[in-house]
Amino acid sequence: MAEILRGTIIGKDGEDGALVKYAKTYATTAINQFNAQYNKSVSDDLGLNWYQYTGTIRKTSREFCKVLKEKKYFHRNEIEGFLTGHVGDKTIPLSQSTGLPYGFDETTTVNNFIILRGGWNCNHQIFPIMDSLVPDSVKRDVEMRVGLV
């Protein structure tokens, strides 16, 4: 019995147990959100409205993250659409329980998306960038879809 419990909590045969999995998830999420809060403060202070979504796509990456990583650049005005599953010209499935893209923290809003990003255990980062670094074709596309302020 003790061995079964140990395996479930800590892990066995090279697989993490529940305690280890959750500890890693909370640690990864906290560190990345801390970094994201700093990036948001910088972008707010500098008045930057364009962002680049960066990071590695993994087997566990969510559909939202895959699509936004492929899109690469986004404008602050697009965030509201992200929360309803609209990323560029693609539509992402929404969770029935939260009404947000799968994996998103249920408290995600337009105001905190830059910090919470793709949700629990999201390893992607959002970096503010100057308008001049965004390709004109991307700017035109966003202008046509959501308008720019």
Regions found by a protein language model. Give the residues of each.
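Domain-core detector
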Residues: 1-121, 127-149
